[in-house]
UniProtKB/Swiss-Prot annotation:
<dbReference type="GO" id="GO:0014857">
    <property type="term" value="P:regulation of skeletal muscle cell proliferation"/>
</dbReference>
<dbReference type="GO" id="GO:0003682">
    <property type="term" value="F:chromatin binding"/>
</dbReference>
<keyword id="KW-0963">Cytoplasm</keyword>
<keyword id="KW-0209">Deafness</keyword>
<dbReference type="GO" id="GO:0005634">
    <property type="term" value="C:nucleus"/>
</dbReference>
<dbReference type="GO" id="GO:2000288">
    <property type="term" value="P:positive regulation of myoblast proliferation"/>
</dbReference>
<dbReference type="GO" id="GO:0007605">
    <property type="term" value="P:sensory perception of sound"/>
</dbReference>
<dbReference type="GO" id="GO:2001014">
    <property type="term" value="P:regulation of skeletal muscle cell differentiation"/>
</dbReference>
<dbReference type="GO" id="GO:0001658">
    <property type="term" value="P:branching involved in ureteric bud morphogenesis"/>
</dbReference>
<dbReference type="GO" id="GO:0030878">
    <property type="term" value="P:thyroid gland development"/>
</dbReference>
<dbReference type="GO" id="GO:0003700">
    <property type="term" value="F:DNA-binding transcription factor activity"/>
</dbReference>
<protein>
    <recommendedName>
        <fullName>Homeobox protein SIX1</fullName>
    </recommendedName>
</protein>
<keyword id="KW-0804">Transcription</keyword>
<dbReference type="GO" id="GO:0006915">
    <property type="term" value="P:apoptotic process"/>
</dbReference>
<dbReference type="GO" id="GO:0072075">
    <property type="term" value="P:metanephric mesenchyme development"/>
</dbReference>
<dbReference type="GO" id="GO:0005730">
    <property type="term" value="C:nucleolus"/>
</dbReference>
<dbReference type="GO" id="GO:0010467">
    <property type="term" value="P:gene expression"/>
</dbReference>
């Protein structure tokens, strides 16, 4: 462990200071410390120093410098999650500034597809919703066995997958909601199919036949004989004659009603007189 020339700290001590300042959130102080480091290639290629520079570049909004650091050096796998977050968040911020609005889930997905993680901070394994496929496989296998893991089982799954307990809980909750929605949709489709089949099986009236029921009053009235029709027609005509101003031949509209009755009696006498005489002659 050799001291750096004209600095007074070893390389290991510099790395330790960088880690402590990062964990404490003292990013401005970390930036000043990095600026004070001597121009030593061996020191500036230290992974802890490079990671500290990336954190400070993101904090100051210097995304171009951040991308340059992340793409130019191969980092250890244990540093990948932190550096991947910096890469994605920086691209999200730039996209939001261009669009003038926050990104939704679809917008973030498009950004990830447009700016994939560099292989310097990614092991090449496909991720889904920020979960590695290996982790999702473990969760799917457990879900098939038990969709409702206990708190202790969730902690064990978190340790096995490298996720947090909250992430594990949310994954199971979302998976149960998707399955319930799929089951409800399937039941709805089955009920609709059964309803359609029942309607097709119902009997329908024969084509061209008389309807079983009719709202017309004529359908509920018995058929009338020709004699009845004649009587009704005659009665209707007589009623119409009484109610109207129609005048019989030889009478004027100004004649009183008793004149009409007298004329009717005269007609009856003229018609019945000869008939009566004929009957008397036949009887004698």
């Amino acid at each position: 462990m050799s001291m750096l020339p004209s600095f007074g700290f070893t390389q290991e001590q510099v790395a330790c200071v960088c880690e402590v300042l990062q964990q404490g959130g003292n990013l401005e102080r970390l930036g000043r410390f990095l600026w004070s480091l001597p121009a030593c290639d061996h020191l500036h290629k230290n992974e802890s120093v490079l990671k500290a520079k990336a954190v400070v570049a993101f904090h100051r909004g210097n995304f171009r410098e951040l991308y340059k650091i992340l793409e130019s050096h191969q980092f250890s796998p244990h540093n990948h999650p932190k550096l991947q977050q910096l890469w994605l968040k920086a691209h999200y911020v730039e996209a939001e500034k261009l669009r003038g609005r926050p990104l939704g889930a679809v917008g973030k997905y498009r950004v990830r597809r447009k700016f994939p993680l560099p292989r310097t901070i990614w092991d090449g394994e496909e991720t889904s919703y920020c979960f590695k496929e290996k982790s999702r496989g473990v969760l799917r296998e457990w879900y098939a066995h038990n969709p409702y893991p206990s708190p202790r089982e969730k902690r064990e799954l978190a340790e096995a997958t490298g996720l947090t307990t909250t992430q594990v809980s949310n994954w199971f909750k979302n998976r149960r909601q998707r399955d319930r929605a799929a089951e409800a949709k399937e039941r709805e489709n089955t009920e609709n199919n059964n309803s359609s089949s029942n309607k097709q099986n119902q009997l329908s009236p024969l084509e061209g036949g008389k309807p079983l029921m009719s709202s017309s009053e004529e359908e509920f009235s018995p058929p009338q004989s020709p004699d009845q029709n004649s009587v009704l027609l005659l009665q209707g005509n007589m009623g119409h004659a009484r109610s109207s101003n129609y005048s019989l031949p030889g009478l004027t509209a100004s004649q009183p009603s008793h004149g009409l009755q007298t004329h009717q009696h005269q007609l009856q006498d003229s018609l019945l007189g000869p008939l009566t005489s004929s009957l008397v002659d036949l009887g004698s």
